């Protein structure tokens, strides 16, 4: 019996539709291989500026409801200079989507999908070679969602409240623990905080994380590190943080962007924002939002040169975490690595391939990989 998965697709703005086309191309190759077992029902919606132009809102209620009913969400990129003057920031469509789905746990891998990419890194090869980090960022709490007092026009004072509750920290810690347990041998977890000075994303965070790992993941090696020390280590010795990094919303926002410089291009990196904790990673379905970490690239959109790797690898993450197809995810990752090692690259990583050329090459490599399995 064929299993149907409903997937909501938000191509997004500027370069978003370009990379999304390559991601869907790869997803269709998986569907053809497994046509007797699975079917992907794709439902397209607008988000961000594209939605604002048509619906006068960054995301419609219909799009939100369809996303909530779907198995997973794929997203290209949101925003751009065309909509700088809108009454409501068009980027808020993504925030509303995350909130509506309660996407609490952001996962960002930081590694080299192809070993030769170490030569493209902003860092020295001997510093970053062997880096393999997965960052788990809590997405729904912290200072971004706390009470806010804007300045009164005199620019004398303003405030933002950093607030966390126990439940928000617990589920982020559990997600990190499950990720660590899913690998053999189990991965170490480094929790980042500011426990020497701050209450919420400091001492409360550290105390709750410590308790969760002591009671639920006693075999996982847990260490705590101050965020400023971690930021230094990302630049100086990133391999010392190999494994899982767990941290709060704002700290995760900053440290993940810093770490994204390691592989050499923002176009290489995927992300997942999960809405639940899998019972067993790689074997359970969890609704999530899957998107590359790069922006909409308005400066190069329409030229056919954007790197679609992050989007394609986001499709792989969707197959792994939301559709319970880990072998297919592994095959996509292997195909991407082979294509890059065979020197089919977009310009941001030293090649001349177009966006579509790269996607086509991945599909060919993927078919060969799937035929061997």
Curated annotation (Swiss-Prot):
Pathway: Mycotoxin biosynthesis. The keyword ATP-binding does not apply. Binds 1 Mg(2+) or Mn(2+) ion per subunit. Mg(2+) binds at residues 228, 253, 257. Substrate binds at residues 92, 98, 108. Its EC number is 1.1.1.85. Its cofactor is Mg(2+); Mn(2+). GO terms for cellular component: cytosol. Signal peptide: none annotated. One of its GO terms (biological process) is L-leucine biosynthetic process. It is an enzyme of class 1 (oxidoreductase). The keyword Manganese applies. The record marks 194 as: Critical for catalysis. Keywords: Amino-acid biosynthesis, Branched-chain amino acid biosynthesis, Leucine biosynthesis, Magnesium, Manganese, Metal-binding, NAD, NADP, Oxidoreductase. It catalyses: (2R,3S)-3-isopropylmalate + NAD(+) = 4-methyl-2-oxopentanoate + CO2 + NADH. Pneumocandin B0 is the starting molecule for the first semisynthetic echinocandin antifungal drug, caspofungin acetate. Pneumocandin B0 is a minor fermentation product, and its industrial production was achieved by a combination of extensive mutation and medium optimization. Inactivation of three of gloP/GLP450-1, gloO/GLP450-2, and gloM/GLOXY1 generates 13 different pneumocandin analogs that lack one, two, three, or four hydroxyl groups on 4R,5R-dihydroxy-ornithine and 3S,4S-dihydroxy-homotyrosine of the parent hexapeptide. NADP(+) binds at residues 294-300, 307. InterPro entries: IsoCit/isopropylmalate_DH_CS, IsoPropMal-DH-like_dom, Isopropylmalate_DH. Belongs to the isocitrate and isopropylmalate dehydrogenases family. 3-isopropylmalate dehydrogenase; part of the gene cluster that mediates the biosynthesis of pneumocandins, lipohexapeptides of the echinocandin family that prevent fungal cell wall formation by non-competitive inhibition of beta-1,3-glucan synthase. The 10,12-dimethylmyristoyl side chain is synthesized by the reducing polyketide synthase gloL/GLPKS4. The thioesterase gloN/GLHYD exclusively interacts with gloL/GLPKS4 to maintain turnover of the polyketide side chain. Homodimer. This is 3-isopropylmalate dehydrogenase gloI. It comes from Glarea lozoyensis (strain ATCC 20868 / MF5171). The lineage of its organism: Eukaryota, Fungi, Dikarya, Ascomycota, Pezizomycotina.
């Amino acid at each position: 019996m064929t299993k149907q998965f409903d997937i909501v697709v938000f191509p997004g703005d500027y370069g978003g539709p370009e990379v999304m086309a390559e991601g869907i191309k790869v997803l269709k190759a998986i569907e053809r291989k497994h046509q007797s077992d699975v079917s992907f029902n794709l439902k397209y919606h607008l988000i961000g500026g594209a939605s604002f132009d048509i619906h006068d809102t960054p995301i419609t209620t219909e799009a939100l409801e369809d996303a909530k009913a779907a198995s997973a969400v794929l997203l290209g990129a949101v925003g751009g200079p065309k909509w700088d003057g809108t009454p409501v920031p068009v980027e808020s469509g993504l925030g509303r989507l995350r909130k509506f789905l309660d996407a609490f746990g952001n996962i960002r891998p930081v590694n080299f999908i192809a070993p030769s990419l170490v030569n493209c890194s902003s860092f020295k090869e001997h510093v970053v070679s062997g880096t393999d980090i997965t960052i788990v960022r809590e997405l729904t709490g912290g200072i971004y969602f706390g009470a806010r007092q804007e300045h009164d026009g005199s620019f004398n004072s303003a405030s933002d409240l950093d607030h966390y509750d126990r439940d928000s920290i617990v589920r982020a810690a559990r997600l990190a623990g499950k990720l660590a347990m899913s690998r053999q041998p189990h991965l170490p977890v480094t929790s980042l905080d500011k426990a020497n000075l701050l209450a919420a994303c400091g001492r409360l965070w550290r105390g709750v994380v410590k308790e969760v790992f002591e009671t639920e993941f006693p075999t996982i090696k847990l260490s705590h590190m101050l965020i400023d020390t971690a930021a230094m280590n990302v630049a100086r010795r990133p391999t010392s943080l190999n494994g899982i990094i767990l941290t709060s919303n704002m700290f995760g926002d900053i440290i993940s962007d810093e770490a994204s410089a390691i592989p050499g291009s923002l176009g290489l990196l995927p992300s997942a924002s999960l809405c639940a904790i899998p019972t067993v990673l790689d074997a359970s379905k969890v609704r999530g939002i899957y998107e590359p970490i790069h922006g909409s690239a308005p400066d190069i959109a329409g030229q056919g040169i954007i790197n679609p790797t992050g989007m394609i690898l986001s499709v792989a993450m969707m197959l792994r975490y939301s559709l319970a197809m880990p072998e297919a995810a592994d095959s996509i990752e292997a195909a991407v690595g082979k294509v890059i090692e065979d020197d089919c690259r977009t310009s941001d990583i030293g090649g001349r391939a177009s966006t579509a050329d790269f996607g086509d090459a991945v599909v060919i490599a993927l078919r060969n990989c799937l035929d061997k399995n």
